[in-house]
C-alpha cells in the first residue's frame, strides 16, 4: 500500500489456492468471537472443482433453498448457507463449531434427499412472494448435480480425499 492509506482487509477465500483443492469437500475456514463471547464458524462447502465446473443458477438456487431446511435439521446452531458467486458451492455459517466430518455427513444426507427423494413440494420458497428470483429454479438440475456430487464423494478435507 502507499503511504497514508490503510491496509486492505484480507479476504480468506481469495488466499486459498483453488488449484490445490479436491472437490467435493467441506473445509473449516475460520471462527469469529463476538463482543459478548458468541462464536460463529464459517465453512466452505465446495461441491464442484473450482475453475472446472460451475452449477447452473437454476440448480444451485434449488439446492440452496432445499438445504436451507435440510441442514437446519441436521446441524445445531445453523445460521445461514449462501452460494458462492462462482457457483461452485456455499459458505455455511454456524453458532459454535462443528467438525468437518459432521458437516460433511449432514451435507451428504441433505444431497441424498435432494437426489433421490425430493419433489417440487420439498423445495421451499418458490413463489414470487417468497423468493427474489422465483423463476430461476430447476429441481431436475439440482437432482442431477446432487447425484454427481454424491458419486464423487464428499471429503472432510479439501486437500486429501477423506470421503465420509
From Swiss-Prot:
Binds 1 Fe cation per subunit. Fe cation binds at residues 61, 65, 131. Its EC number is 4.4.1.21. The keyword Iron applies. Its cofactor is Fe cation. GO terms for molecular function: iron ion binding; S-ribosylhomocysteine lyase activity. One of its GO terms (biological process) is quorum sensing. Signal peptide: none annotated. The keyword Isomerase does not apply. Keywords: Autoinducer synthesis, Iron, Lyase, Metal-binding, Quorum sensing. Belongs to the LuxS family. Involved in the synthesis of autoinducer 2 (AI-2) which is secreted by bacteria and is used to communicate both the cell density and the metabolic potential of the environment. The regulation of gene expression in response to changes in cell density is called quorum sensing. Catalyzes the transformation of S-ribosylhomocysteine (RHC) to homocysteine (HC) and 4,5-dihydroxy-2,3-pentadione (DPD). Homodimer. PANTHER family: S-RIBOSYLHOMOCYSTEINE LYASE. This is S-ribosylhomocysteine lyase.
